[in-house]
């Protein structure tokens, strides 16, 4: 069998912002040609309706670059029924790590206020614009148009912060020279043992393609209030309807994952002849923010730059609502790649079972986040016939029981004999919680296949609630900031969700922080 090297094409999209003059003509865009269902808002009772409520398009921009991805509600802080008049209502949106590489905020939480090397961001790299988008009824938001549905982008009043990134989340790092994973704790003196390749060390920390951003909504701001009323409240209602935190995040074994059908809905950026409208932070809104002297707003970067409507009108590619459902009705949802389909592609996916990828055994799965190289780790889903286009990175992957199985991040490419890569129809997702499973230990390694990657098999991990093998997970942030997700953990009887309350490493950090506060001397 011919073995092909495997790469992946990320599903986020980067656009160079066009320079525009005063005069312009709105482009006539072609209709996006695809077998998937597009630009159709799911009705109540539709299997895609829950994905629709939870999901948004994300848009980050610097002074020269525009980046798009897809995100979904994972958590929040505040009472949605009686929101505060002074403190912002905080929403937490999950997406991919490679999507939030576009978020570079000097007022972010540490260590995200600098790059991964501890250096200040360059002026051209700083995020100056952020907006949330959704394909919806424009009339709900006061947009005057004859269109019954449109892509509506709303600029929030402040630049988001980073709540969590799944980089360096396990005690393993990858040696680019030997193509093997090593335990970091086994390295006595990493600075001496690492080898320099070009300008970087041979060792790369592990990452999972998952991250969470914090978006503050100041409800005295018209645009933030629109986001809260028309985007966030329906998402919270659906989140709770699906069972809230305790029921929403699945932890299935690999055999159970193989049998699932996965429901996905996202926002790829493609040429699509739909109406698109932006609701920006106009001059009158920005002035209101500046004269409103709320101290809490000093903790955030308020947006002072906006996109004008003509920026969208002359843009050929627009975020477009897509479902992994065929127009003909031949299929609804995605199945994992079968062994037969994998053999037809002559592709080694480092898999343990049908359609399950082990990223630790594939050397081409790596990325740069905030100017540092990372190597992908953990388990993934190889989704047959799910090649969503750029902009769909971060799409939520729900199983048939309406539980969160993972997050979509790209499309597989295979290296051909002539040196060119061929894009496949296979989508890829990162599994968020990997159950302790005998199948992980039973897998036997093939020496022939090891030429394409490491012989190491990924360990169990849980990047939502944590476990003994996961040193960096989202519940740590949720506990520190007392979010809704942590309140659900506290009230739950499920012990597997409560690891954060018994994490020995976290307890050491908390005790050290208390000791530091107690030993502080105050000088008058």
From Swiss-Prot:
Protein name: Uncharacterized lipoprotein MPN_084
Membrane topology of the entry: Lipid-anchor
Entry similarity comment: Belongs to the MG067/MG068/MG395 family.
Pfam family, one: Mycop_pep_DUF31
Coiled coil stretches, renumbered: none
Listed InterPro entries: Mycoplasma_peptidase_DUF31 (IPR022382), Peptidase_S1_PA (IPR009003), Uncharacterised_MG067 (IPR022381)
Superkingdom of origin: Bacteria
Signal peptide boundaries: 1-21
